[in-house]
């Protein structure tokens, strides 16, 4: 088994700034070339009170002719423990199921392209003082909503001399029949029709070793919605999306963009130990069109990180 534990202070507002994650990976779990991943995440505030718990598993099963099937399940609970007003009585439970086929369509010494198509199903239950309540779009007065969508596209990665890159191009299509009748009626009040929700997007990352001890990492992504989307199809901004110095999930919208950059300066290195200074900058924006109402938001952050690398752990201290 391969194990990794991380402790960070870029959790989400309300559920707690401190985020502890434990990840376990087992290659060749049931057969050769398969893999099993299990992850546990806890958010807490400084009291400490637990504001969120997320548990997930993923299994990748190799098929013939460069094909793979990936299935995953995630369960989460969220409470706003940092607040002292009525928001503290709000809580959510979420389920996410994914089934995805992948196929390697091109592979060479320095690059690879994979095609994928996956089915995503999500359910959210919302509560006010422990009673199911209409707190999310689509939930109606029954207090729960289920949605599903297809996502298909291409993943790619490659390298050449001092540069390496990766990214994806994708399209998403909502599925009408996964939501209940009362949920579709609730969505319609906001101009959302699950079966007509669709979007396209792309993302890319570039790592460039400029010279010994100096590296540059760049990232860009964007999404365009053709019609109003439900929550699981939206474009999110925060540290989970790559913008360092922000809460994990700060804002989201149907369409959006983001860009990130960091300069990695390795000031000392010996064997497998190193000390790095990393200035970083990131920004993004989102917007949503619902009937005659348009909402927009933009965020950004910049700062510097001191990173100490040991064979068994990595320590980062940052200023934003």
Where are these regions (language model features)?
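Outer-membrane beta-barrel initiation region
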Residues: 1-70, 107
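Outer-membrane beta-barrel domain signature
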Residues: 9-15, 44-48, 84-90, 137-145, ...
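C-terminal transmembrane beta-barrel domains of outer membrane proteins
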Residues: 186-320
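Repeated loop/turn-to-beta-strand initiation elements of outer-membrane beta-barrel proteins
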Residues: 2-3, 29-36, 64-71, 107-113, ...
